[in-house]
Amino acid sequence: MKKQKGFTLIELLVVIAIIGLLSTLAVVALNNARMKARDARRVTDVKQMQTALELYYNDAGKYPASVATGSTTSGTCLSTSSTTPEASGFTAVCNPGGVIYMAMVPFSPTPVDAGCATSTDYAYTRDDDNGTTYTINYCLGAAVGEIPKGSRRATPAGIR
């Protein structure tokens, strides 16, 4: 009797099942890596905003005014104006002739991570009329170093 060449149905099913399992594990690991990368970027963005705000504070003697209620600072410019001081702070377009501290406040990376609101853009608020303190609200899908996941805030005292 001649021996047939090839694989049996059972052998093929076992190989397909193993490939499927390995693919699933790779996708899960990749999604976790992407979430960690987005969160690391969020922390870096907030630190850059804090640096720009401190430079602004050193020059102006106070932090810039809050943006409109319900708005975010993402996509705006942080600058001063030499001709119209009231136009200093977060504006839609950088003021020509002024000092630019941050040409464009970054947008939070997408997609939104679990446990965060539908909009996770960075929201800046000056906490008092004297301009001595502020809050930047942001959200993390997972802990980054010592910073726990969830809704977080940054102030002149640091990131929490």
Report residues per predicted region.
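Conserved beta-strand elements of beta-rich interaction domains across eukaryotes
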Residues: 1-2, 141
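Extracellular/periplasmic head regions of type IV pilus-like filament subunits
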Residues: 54-138
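N-terminal single-pass transmembrane signal-anchor helix
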Residues: 2-30, 34
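Aliphatic-rich helix starts adjacent to a transmembrane/signal segment
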Residues: 27-47
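Short, surface-exposed interaction loops/tails
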Residues: 128-160
